[in-house]
Amino acid sequence: MKKTIHSRRIASSLLALAALAASGSVLAAGNAILAIGQQPETLDPYNTNTTMTTAVTKTFYEGLFQFDKDLKVRNVLAESYDVSKDGLVYTFKLRAGVKFHDGTEFNAAAVKTNLDRVMNPENRLLRATQFNRIAKVEAVNPLSLRITLKEPFGPFINSLAHASAAIISPAALQKWGKDIAFHPVGTGPFEFVEWKQTEAIVGKKFDGYWKKGYPKVDGVSWKPVLENNTRAAMLQTGEADFAYPLPYEQAAILKKVDKIEVVT
């Protein structure tokens, strides 16, 4: 089994790590261990501007769309959408049969709850400006959502494809309030197990995941390892399956190790 170190620019490689672990492309089974260079400050995707933290939240959360490895927008919880001729009204057809980790249904009302939350200035969420072009959000029916913009904005779907535009369980938001930052409940491939602040954020395979056959691994652990040499050593000893970031001099050394794949 080859270990992987990602030394690509952070915006593309880190956000792919959770998906790579879930796909099992380098793991036959078991748990994926990801050694990362900093401690996430929250697990609320709407309240961080840190790419590392956003990457971790992708373990548990999904949005209507996402960027693939080539930075092209792909459908996730939205199956399709239409735009009015004036560019103001977006109507989305949502994916049926999707459940949150708490067993509640994903639907248009859930999307509205999340967008209304981030747009509410009283909540003071860090990603609010990403959604400030939205005038209103309407749940037309359980699987149809309508978003009206204040003015036409061509890259609007890109805003919804960003990992911060994740859909949190409304029931969990009601239960935890601001503490949702420590109790993530989404529709992603892994459900939250625990967060030991200096040790690891742990997720387990979500048996009710809508994408059949995924995830390919039983669990994932994000371990904050602040020292570069320690992350490199963890790859070599098998204590970690992925590591990010590492300096180029470390990458050059690891390229010579047969069981380690360096992606640049």
Residue ranges of each PLM-predicted region?
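N-terminal signal peptide c-region/cleavage motif recognized by signal peptidases
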Residues: 23-24
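Gly/Pro-rich hinge or "lid" segments in bacterial periplasmic/extracellular proteins
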Residues: 161-215, 219-221
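Ligand-binding "clamshell"
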Residues: 30, 131, 252-264
